[in-house]
Regions:
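N-terminal targeting signals for export/organelle localization
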Residues: 1-21, 127
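Thiol-based oxidoreductase modules, predominantly thioredoxin-like and allied folds used
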Residues: 20-22, 44, 55-83
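A short beta-strand-turn-helix
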Residues: 20-40
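Short pre-active-site segment immediately N-terminal to redox-active cysteine/selenocysteine motifs
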Residues: 38, 45-48, 93
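Detector for the c-type heme attachment site
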Residues: 53-55, 89
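Non-catalytic, surface beta->alpha helical segment in thiol-disulfide oxidoreductase systems
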Residues: 92-127
Length: 127
């Protein structure tokens, strides 16, 4: 269940780039460096994970409404070396969602959450 940039072309404020896949080799650029310009939410997920499939549509609805102030990096932990990202950040279960600002993790949540929770989670960290 890999997301492609073109799946989100309807999102004009983000020019289709607010929601994207990343991996271990691009994490520094896509998340850490990018978080100096805007919030970057990282969804650590797995295809076999039921709660991950519940959370994904919630995130896909919420992120585009922030007009480019928040980006969502999707990391499928079972692809390549991506589990190393989960290990580095101590993710014990999936989904785990991390929020980065100014190059640092500032918050996280675990498991599937409703839309209002995700909005409050983001709003707490917007400038």
């Amino acid at each position: 269940m890999t997301l492609q940039h073109h799946d989100h072309q309807h999102d004009k404020a983000c020019a289709g780039q607010c929601i994207f896949d990343t991996d271990l080799h691009h994490f520094e650029r896509d998340v850490i460096e990018a978080s100096h310009k805007q919030l970057v939410m990282v969804d650590l997920w797995a295809d076999w994970c039921g709660p991950c499939h519940f959370l994904t549509p919630v995130l896909l609805r919420v992120i585009p409404t922030y007009d480019g102030k928040v980006r969502l990096a999707k990391v499928e932990v079972d692809e390549g070396d991506n589990m190393k990202i989960a290990g580095k950040y101590g993710a014990r279960g999936f989904p785990t969602v991390l929020l980065f600002k100014n190059g640092e993790e500032v918050a996280r949540f675990h498991s599937a959450k409703p839309e209002h929770f995700v909005r409050e989670f983001i709003d707490e960290h917007l400038d």
